[in-house]
């Protein structure tokens, strides 16, 4: 881990784990046979992530350990499972859906027989993470203008999958600051996140938009649904759900503020 991976609450930021998963996934492909190395070089796209955060991790010079395996293989996609450990403690469970992509023709393709055969050597089906319920974003929702930075773009020429989590986070912080507030003594933890990638995001000067609404309000928790979109064309680039838990029970004022952006109240 890096010092820059820490957030304002003194532990590894939830979005940093997505970067760790990517590093492990790339290392897996590059350390395999030339066939899987070429799979990475010719193009692979992430289509979804699921992350379950089990333990906050503080900064340490002890490295985190990521166990990785292939947990499903289809005709034109495969999924990778992960467990991230802090010492002996399981900190994060995750799953990534991946599809092969032909960068030359700019289109999806099927896995070849050699690719399937080599991926199957790492096949170890595990108990899946239950998907968080998907809800459509209501017309009345929190809006956050999103500026893509030049450094957000990866070697494939579009915004890297990790950055989407940063974008969802920036919008979430804006909404939370407007509702429950970020008091020094308050601790809010992301415990679960699902994200689907629908279209690549390109660099441009004009802002995109992240829309966020509250789908569930509990005693100490709330769930947010979000979309990254183009406000001009209404094109949707990604959808996400995030579960946030606090150490204290939500106050009446906080619940009322969250309800202002609630899906159920519309």
Kindly give the residue locations of the regions a language model identified:
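Preference for bulky hydrophobic residues occupying beta-strand positions
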Residues: 1, 51, 68, 82, ...
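Short histidine-centered beta-strand/loop micro-motifs
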Residues: 9-11, 55-56, 60-62, 155-158, ...
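HotDog/MaoC-like acyl-thioester-processing domains
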Residues: 53-65, 69-136, 202-204, 214-266
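Hot-dog-fold acyl-thioester-processing enzymes
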Residues: 1-48, 93, 99-192, 247-266
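Sequence-level detector for tyrosine residue identity
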Residues: 17-20, 53, 59, 82-85, ...
């Amino acid at each position: 881990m890096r010092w820059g991976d820490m957030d304002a609450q003194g532990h590894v930021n939830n979005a940093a784990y997505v970067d760790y998963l990517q590093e492990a996934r790339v290392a897996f492909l590059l350390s395999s046979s030339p066939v899987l190395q070429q799979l990475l070089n010719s193009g692979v796209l992430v289509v979804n992530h699921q992350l379950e955060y089990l333990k906050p991790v503080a900064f340490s010079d002890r490295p985190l350990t990521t166990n990785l395996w292939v947990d499903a293989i289809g005709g034109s996609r495969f999924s990778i499972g992960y467990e991230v450990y802090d010492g002996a403690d399981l900190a994060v469970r995750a799953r990534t859906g991946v599809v092969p992509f032909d960068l030359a023709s700019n289109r999806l393709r099927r896995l070849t027989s050699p690719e399937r055969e080599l991926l199957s050597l790492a096949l170890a089906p595990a108990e899946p993470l239950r998907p968080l319920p998907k809800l459509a974003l209501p017309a009345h929702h929190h809006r956050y203008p999103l500026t893509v930075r030049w450094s957000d773009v990866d070697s494939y020429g579009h915004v890297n999958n990790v950055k989407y989590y940063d974008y969802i986070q920036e919008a979430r912080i804006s909404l939370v600051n407007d509702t429950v507030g970020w008091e020094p003594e308050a601790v809010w933890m992301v415990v679960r996140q699902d994200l689907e990638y629908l279209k690549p995001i390109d660099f441009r000067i004009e802002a995109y938009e992240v829309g966020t609404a509250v789908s569930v309000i509990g005693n100490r928790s709330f769930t947010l649904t979000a979309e990254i979109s183009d406000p001009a064309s209404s094109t949707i680039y990604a959808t996400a759900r995030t579960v946030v838990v606090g150490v204290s029970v939500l106050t009446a004022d906080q619940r009322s503020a969250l309800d202002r952006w609630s899906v159920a109240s519309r």
